[in-house]
Design a protein with these regions (language model features):
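Charged, amphipathic alpha-helical coiled-coil/dimerization segments
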Residues: 5, 83-142
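N-terminal leader segment of winged-helix/HTH proteins
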Residues: 1-41, 88-90
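N-terminal helix-turn-helix DNA-binding core of bacterial DNA-binding proteins
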Residues: 32-74
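Short, locally clustered residues in the helix-turn-helix/winged-helix DNA-binding domain
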Residues: 24, 52-59, 119, 145
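Pre-recognition alpha-helix immediately N-terminal to the DNA-recognition helix
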Residues: 22, 49-53, 113, 139
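Short, hydrophobic-biased segments on the C-terminal half of alpha helices
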Residues: 64, 82-83
Length: 149
């Protein structure tokens, strides 16, 4: 299938417009696949993103502001998502010693184990791009980087 068939639109203003619509459509499609992958463990794709960010910085804590800056979806309500992870004991929060207005967030052992479990299913996530060769995936990544300048 192509984007024209997927969204039932035959005409676009130009190829850049078509590419932009295709990127947006593909973003939604990939997020749905990612949701299927992480929902098996009872978390959302935004929670998964935060846990991965925290694991990458572990054991050093991050403020919610630092987490938001690193998130894929910058429009997410980071504080609310962190609170949901806290209620699942996947993260812990501590008032920042340097600035009491900030909260430091770290991933817990339970959060690390959950990510380890999801890492064991990484092939399922890689399947999202299974129609691409390694070379094509690399080329796509370079093109997406180029779009962002």
């Amino acid at each position: 299938m192509g984007i024209s068939k997927d969204i039932h639109q035959a005409k676009f203003r130009n190829e850049r417009h078509k590419a932009l619509i295709n990127i947006l459509f593909t973003y939604g499609w990939t997020v749905e696949r990612l949701k299927e992958y992480v929902s098996e463990e009872g978390i959302t794709h935004q929670q998964f993103n935060i846990l991965r960010i925290l694991r990458g910085n572990h054991p050093t804590p991050l403020s919610t502001l630092s987490i938001r800056e690193r998130m894929i979806d910058k429009m997410s309500d980071t504080s609310r998502i962190v609170d949901r992870l806290l209620s699942k004991a996947l993260v812990k929060k501590v008032v920042c010693k340097k600035d009491r207005r900030l909260v430091d967030v770290t991933i817990t052992e339970k959060g690390l184990k959950l990510l380890d479990k999801l890492d064991g299913k990484q092939d399922k996530m890689d399947d999202i791009l299974s129609n691409l060769s390694e070379k094509e995936a690399s080329g796509l990544s370079k093109l997406l980087d180029k779009i962002r300048g």
